[in-house]
């Protein structure tokens, strides 16, 4: 009727613009009428493809072909918001919802059935034939068989009403509400990686629709923000932007494939090219972005790895979860077992081995008690134990003082100092501190990155660290772990009879010195050419531990040079010093005889000799004798040995002195079957080889080797050499203190000091004096070493003469020689003295070569 009425207008009377506008209105209204009467079209798939599928016996389901097949008696409804919509290619929300909801096929069908035909308002005869999930879009296509009493339009309307009513009953209906839309087009069921978007792209296969037509067709699915009609460049593509994803998804699935006035609409999601904020930031702001990235990585590494490292350091100190004997449980079990076995041995009269460890230490029991008392004191504990190499500092502390201590951390500076490469140093430091995990290879990577970034941006990232800073970070992390161990049982509030008392951390640590860990730093020398920073870092770290009163610190050192380094770290702290020296002759003899008691008895017994049975521990206790346990063992050994054997042992012990490591080596050799004199000779020979390799070989600097040989000659004749005698020696004149201290640090000699001034020079250990004599008495070796020493002296004196001759040359050209007569006489005397030394050395070399 509308079309008939519009054709009766008097078109001839209209102006041209009005005529054009009128024609446009008529055309738009005519197309709107066609739009209202639009019928769903059929998405055409090549019949040849369908025939091929049928011939092959393959299925033609929507999942396999992308096309939904239905009859005229069926209606197709799209339900949205049934699944979680895919937000990315990986779709993590789908996996999350699988844990919270039952999304099986039967559960989804039951849900669709209850929404479309609920029990309180059913559609009688409605049958759910099939469901096709579109999980990427979060919806489901459902095919229903229309009951005979209803038309398709009535069924669609009832399903929409029931779905809206049923899905709004939930308290969270704003988020879980489901909408149902009849499918007007022919949807394409695809699972391509085309993520849903709020903008849909409409491709017109035929004349394009106007904005009014597009709005009328797509508005029912959601609020439209904007419509982008076809342009002159692309006249068959339009875009519709929705406010929500649900509107765009429903429009795409319900309208795609519809045919309106010979125009088929194909709808897809707009392919969003997302400008990534982070990538754009890195691309456009490189100088800022790269340092920020590395800073974030560093913060992340600290947050993740530092707690693990603190835990591993605590484990290193406490051995709480360790299966070694340092574990507290194993220590208690070992103590219980040892005490039980000791009681059984005592009851049966068996020997007890515990006394054998004490004889050498009888003269040091007082020092052990002092050290234990210092660890139990409430004031800050900073102990320095000094003694020559091999004097038993380590055993005194670790075996006799801290054997039953729970929390002990032992650090060996020698392993750190001797690390030649940075990765090796970091591994050794981490191993001793328990610092795990550590990645030494990162240093090389960060170094390359730092250079690369510096080339790109002109500035360093600061990501690469030196080994000094990394070692300092290890110590800082260790400090936090030590503090946590010390305050493990600390409680801020303590309940008493009068109420609650607030206890400070300082007061708790002052009252419980046993809770503080003990840090033992061994071989602390104070100076080193390689990795010398270790001493400063350790001393500063130890000073901080003592100042915070969270640990006891014990330094083991061989020289007094370390005191200067420690004084710099703790200038106002008074150190507790413990000086260890060699055992006396009597105690050395008692130790060796007590250790050899059982061996001598069973050795003579096996040879068939008649020897007195040693008394058991039980018999010794029952005798109630005034003699000590050590004296008893020594007397038994003296009874077993004859006078000649005792004299042989005494003669062998004379060169060994009281150095504990040498005494232990001597005992092991005798127990292995060597005679005392034979054991001593082999030890002297071994010491001489060690001296030759370290100080007298061809690989050693000739000047140092000559200085060492001169001291060897002097110390073989005299046990002690005053330092003043060395000052005038030719090879020591230039820098006597430097040469002597270098030989001391290398372990050839030891020097006593008086208020820092060098006084007396001795061999590094008593056995070395016998080794010096052995080297001097070896004719072939002594001849080679003596010749090398004399040649060095000749070269030294020759160099001095050349220097004086250079000074004489300009003086000889002066006309009046009387002006410089005094200087000429001085230089002449010097040259004559050096010539005399050279003549004497050459004469000795000549005699040695005969």
Swiss-Prot record:
Keywords: Membrane, Mitochondrion, Mitochondrion inner membrane, mRNA processing, RNA-binding, Transit peptide, Transmembrane, Transmembrane helix. Residues 309-850 are mitochondrial intermembrane. Residues 198-272 form the RRM domain. It holds the Pfam family RNA12. It is found in: Mitochondrion inner membrane. Belongs to the YME2 family. This is Mitochondrial escape protein 2. It comes from Saccharomyces cerevisiae (strain YJM789). The gene is YME2.
């Amino acid at each position: 009727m509308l079309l008939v009425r519009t054709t009766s207008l008097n078109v001839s009377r209209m102006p041209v613009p009005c005529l054009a506008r009128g024609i446009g209105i008529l055309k738009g209204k005519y197309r709107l009428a066609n739009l209202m009467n639009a019928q769903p079209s059929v998405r055409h798939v090549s019949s040849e493809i369908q025939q091929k599928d049928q011939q092959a016996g393959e299925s033609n389901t929507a999942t396999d072909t992308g096309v939904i097949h239905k009859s005229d008696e069926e209606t197709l409804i799209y339900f949205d918001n049934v699944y979680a919509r895919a937000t990315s290619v990986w779709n993590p929300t789908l996996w999350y919802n699988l844990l919270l909801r039952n999304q099986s096929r039967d559960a989804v069908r039951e849900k669709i059935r209850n929404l479309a035909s609920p029990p309180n308002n059913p559609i009688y005869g409605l049958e759910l034939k099939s469901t096709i999930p579109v999980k990427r879009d979060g919806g489901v296509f459902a095919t229903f068989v229309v009951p005979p009493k209803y038309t398709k339009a009535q069924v669609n309307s009832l399903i929409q009403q029931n779905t809206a009513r049923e899905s709004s009953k939930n308290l969270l209906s704003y988020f879980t509400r489901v909408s149902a839309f009849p499918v007007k087009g022919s949807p394409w069921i695809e699972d391509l990686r085309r993520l849903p978007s709020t903008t849909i792209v409409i491709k017109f296969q035929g004349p394009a629709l106007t904005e009014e037509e597009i709005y009328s067709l797509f508005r029912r699915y959601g609020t439209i923000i904007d419509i982008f009609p076809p342009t002159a460049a692309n006249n068959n593509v339009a875009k519709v932007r929705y406010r929500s994803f649900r509107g765009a998804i429903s429009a795409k699935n319900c309208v795609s494939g519809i045919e309106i006035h010979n125009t088929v609409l194909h709808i897809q999601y707009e392919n969003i090219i997302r400008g990534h904020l982070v990538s754009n930031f890195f691309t456009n702001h490189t100088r800022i972005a790269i340092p920020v990235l590395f800073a974030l990585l560093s913060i992340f590494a600290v947050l993740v790895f530092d707690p693990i490292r603190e835990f591993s350091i605590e484990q290193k100190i406490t051995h709480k979860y360790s299966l070694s004997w340092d574990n507290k449980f194993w220590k208690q079990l070992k103590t219980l077992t040892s005490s039980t076995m000791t009681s059984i041995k005592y009851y049966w009269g068996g020997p007890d081995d515990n006394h054998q460890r004490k004889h050498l230490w009888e003269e040091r029991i007082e020092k052990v008690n002092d050290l234990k008392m210092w660890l139990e004191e409430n004031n800050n504990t900073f102990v320095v134990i000094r003694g020559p190499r091999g004097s038993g500092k380590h055993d005194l502390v670790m075996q006799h003082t801290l054997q039953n201590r729970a929390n002990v951390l032992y650090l060996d500076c020698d392993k750190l100092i001797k690390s030649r490469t940075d990765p090796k140093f970091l591994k050794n430091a981490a191993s001793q501190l328990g610092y795990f995990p550590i990645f030494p290879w990162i240093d090389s990577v960060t170094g390359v990155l730092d250079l690369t970034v510096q080339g790109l941006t002109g500035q360093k990232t600061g990501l690469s660290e030196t080994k000094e800073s990394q070692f300092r970070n290890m110590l800082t992390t260790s400090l936090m772990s030590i503090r946590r161990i010390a305050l493990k049982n600390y409680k801020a509030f303590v309940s008493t009879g009068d109420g609650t008392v607030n206890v400070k951390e300082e007061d708790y640590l002052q009252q419980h010195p046993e809770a503080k860990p003990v840090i033992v730093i061994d071989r602390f020398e104070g100076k080193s050419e390689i990795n010398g920073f270790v001493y400063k870092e350790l001393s500063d770290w130890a000073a901080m531990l003592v100042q915070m009163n969270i640990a006891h610190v014990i330094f083991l050192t061989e020289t007094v040079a370390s005191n200067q380094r420690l004084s710099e770290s703790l200038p106002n702290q008074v150190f507790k010093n413990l000086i260890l020296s060699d055992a006396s002759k009597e105690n050395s003899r008692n130790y060796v005889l007590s250790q050899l008691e059982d061996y001598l008895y069973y050795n003579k017994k096996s040879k068939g000799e008649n020897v007195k049975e040693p008394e058991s521990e039980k018999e010794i206790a029952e005798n109630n004798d005034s003699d000590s346990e050590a004296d008893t063992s020594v007397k038994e050994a003296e009874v077993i040995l004859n006078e000649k054997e005792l004299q042989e042992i005494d003669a062998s012990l004379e060169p060994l002195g009281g150095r504990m490591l040498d005494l232990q080596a001597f005992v092991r050799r005798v127990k292995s079957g060597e005679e005392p004199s034979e054991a001593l000779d082999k030890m002297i020979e071994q010491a001489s080889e060690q001296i030759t390799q370290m100080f007298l070989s061809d690989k050693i600097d000739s000047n140092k080797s000559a200085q060492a040989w001169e001291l060897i000659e002097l110390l073989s004749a005299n046990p002690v050499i005053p330092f003043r005698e060395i000052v005038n020696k030719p090879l020591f004149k230039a820098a006597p203190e430097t040469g002597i201290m270098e030989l001391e640090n290398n372990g050839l000699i030891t020097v006593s000091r008086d208020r820092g001034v060098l006084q007396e020079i001795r061999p590094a250990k008593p056995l070395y004096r016998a080794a010096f004599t052995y080297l001097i008495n070896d004719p072939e070796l002594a001849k080679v070493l003596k010749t090398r020493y004399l040649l060095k002296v000749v070269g030294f004196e020759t160099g001095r003469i050349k220097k004086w001759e250079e000074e004489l040359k300009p003086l000889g050209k002066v006309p009046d020689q009387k002006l410089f007569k005094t200087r000429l006489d001085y230089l002449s005397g010097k040259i004559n003295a050096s010539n005399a030394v050279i003549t004497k050395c050459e004469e000795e070399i000549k005699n040695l070569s005969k």
